Amino acid sequence: MSRIAALPDHLVNQIAAGEVVERPANALKEIVENSIDAGATAIDVELAGGGIRLIRVSDNGGGIHPDDIELALHRHATSKIKTLNDLEHVASMGFRGEGLASIASVSRLTLTSRQEDSSHATQVKAEDGKLSSPTAAAHPVGTTIEAAELFFNTPARRKFLKSEATEYAHCATMLERLALAHPHIAFSLKRDGKQVFKLPAQSLHERIAAIVGDDFQTASLEIDSDNGALRLYGAIAKPTFAKGKTDKQYCFVNHRFVRDKVMLHAVKQAYRDVLHNALTPAFVLFLDLPPEAVDVNVHPTKTEIRFRDSQQVHQLVFHTLNKALADTRADLTESVSNAGEVLHDITGVTPAPMPSENNSENLFDRASNYPTGNKSDTHNAFGSSGKTAPMPYQSAYAPQQRSLSLRESRAAMNTYAELYKKTDDIDLELSRFEQARFGNMPSETPAPQTDTPLSDGIPSPSELPPLGFAIAQLLGIYILAQAEDSLLLIDMHAAAERVNYEKMKRQRQENGNLQSQRLLIPVTFAASHEECAALADHAEALAGFGLELSDMGGNTLAVRAAPAMLGKSDVVSLARDVLNEFAQVGSSQTIEEHENHILATMSCHGSIRAGRRLTLPEMNALLRDMENTPRSNQCNHGRPTWVKLTLKELDALFLRGQ
């Protein structure tokens, strides 16, 4: 039987390297974090062969004392902690003393360093666990570490590496995360001798734009809030910027990139009302908290952490993001979709841009002068205006034309004749609506006939509400509205769905339940066994949502009351869908956790359906509701509720100004 024996140090280091250094990107992270801890203000990185053949990191930090340079390559040797209390309050990026020792055990490593008060630098080399004697070398103040031929002495490990291009991509991503977390440090990267990027020390906003991209910059909302000793800040993308990938999700805790389930769950919960299907949000979040409130000593790579009070962190992240997203009302933000981009997606041709004018004021800049309710203080974090050169005539968008058949022409004429036929009732209703909503508008009583131009009766641009006034209903689906300098298209069902949903949520929060209205005659329907079981299990909870159902026996249910807010909705279809939602609530979920999904289902039933003809006052009432409703830029499923076509885009379609 074999005897127990202590493993040699070089073998221990190679085993430890399996946890710390999985690939070149991990080695790069350990070295760069040492440079950050050394107080460097400039860090230069060179990679060869994707980091497999060479990783070279140079910094201008404080350097290593000549007497400590050999010790720096030994296991568990560090200057950052000395006691257990230091470990509990550690604020540095590294503290284990394992990184350099692990890298030195699986590569040919050269360490050169010089402190400011030293006349020359000191250099030491390590290969296969063996250290050379320190020698004098020429080097500016700071440190340079070269790790060559990674895993040269562990061929089995090297076989698990991917291609050089893939390993380089991981290294570049790792360096971008570190650069994003430390914008006050200048970073540069060279790949096989070619400069990839060179970032100067800059502000956080500038660094986010440089790393995450201009598209994120223009579609982001700035956040900054605190809760006691915790502070959360950064930028989150508007819901329409959401993608199917998670490559633009960054969480930093005390400037350390982490993958934390608590924070990610809070982000997901905040976006759940405004994201469509499987899309994921983009964000850059920084959480600062006392070092003793978080345990970073969970995993050797330090990307997994543990909060002392995870509930406090979750609440801060959720409420901060939820408030920022709730403030994306139609009176505060631009359209969630740009009509010019939509035209490009459909036709493949970009409309010719118009020459820029001096008056480039945003459509909603005057919204504060219009009585649409309380405004939020949330602003776009990175506003910018880009100018593009006019397109040549040949490439400008030309609308496709086709003749209508006689049947199509008659159908269209009949539709619009019926919709816009003049009646005294509609004229009186419209004038009353405008008088009630806008006191400064023309009164109901006709003014004496004069020679004053007709345009004098039209509201001035400063009097227009953010979403303007409805002028038509298109195809029974969309509302066409005119604002100050643009036309707006509103999906009436999607908009009404969001308005009803937010009203229901507010009513549930204020009263604890939805107001119900009893039916004069109960409506019965044949139910499945699952629907009957859901009623038996959740009858009281259903009543809280304004639905009163009773079991008539023989798999027959009767609807006796429905939510008053939903009006003339199909109560049977509503009851079936809500029962199905309740049936899906498993033992791991409560009704409260599933509440918003149930309310979203109910609001869909009570919203305007396609094909329903609306009067102008009804259309305008919906627009005003949108201006006062949180998250009204998206419906409950995350789809946009309105788009804008500016005057410049309209002119470009007709080649005006070419």
Swiss-Prot record:
Q: Which UniProt keywords apply?
A: DNA damage, DNA repair
Region described as Disordered: spans on this chain: 114-137
Please give one Pfam family short name: MutL_C
Q: Name one GO molecular function term.
A: mismatched DNA binding
The record's annotation in InterPro entries points to: DNA_mismatch_repair_CS, DNA_mismatch_repair_MutL, DNA_mismatch_S5_2-like, HATPase_C_sf, MutL/Mlh/PMS, MutL/Mlh/Pms-like, MutL_C, MutL_C_dimsub
Which SUPFAM superfamilies does the record match to this protein?
ATPase domain of HSP90 chaperone/DNA topoisomerase II/histidine kinase (SSF55874), DNA mismatch repair protein MutL (SSF118116), Ribosomal protein S5 domain 2-like (SSF54211)
Any one GO CC term of this protein is: mismatch repair complex
- Compositional bias annotation for Basic and acidic residues: 114-130
According to its UniProt entry, one GO biological process term is: mismatch repair
Q: Does the keyword Signal apply?
A: no
Q: Does the keyword Transit peptide apply?
A: no
Its biological purpose is as follows: This protein is involved in the repair of mismatches in DNA. It is required for dam-dependent methyl-directed DNA mismatch repair. May act as a 'molecular matchmaker', a protein that promotes the formation of a stable complex between two or more DNA-binding proteins in an ATP-dependent manner without itself being part of a final effector complex.
Q: Give the family from UniProt.
A: Belongs to the DNA mismatch repair MutL/HexB family.
Which NCBIfam families does this chain map to?
A: mutl, PRK00095.1-2
Q: What is the protein name for this chain?
A: DNA mismatch repair protein MutL
Please tell me the species this chain comes from. Neisseria meningitidis serogroup C / serotype 2a (strain ATCC 700532 / DSM 15464 / FAM18)
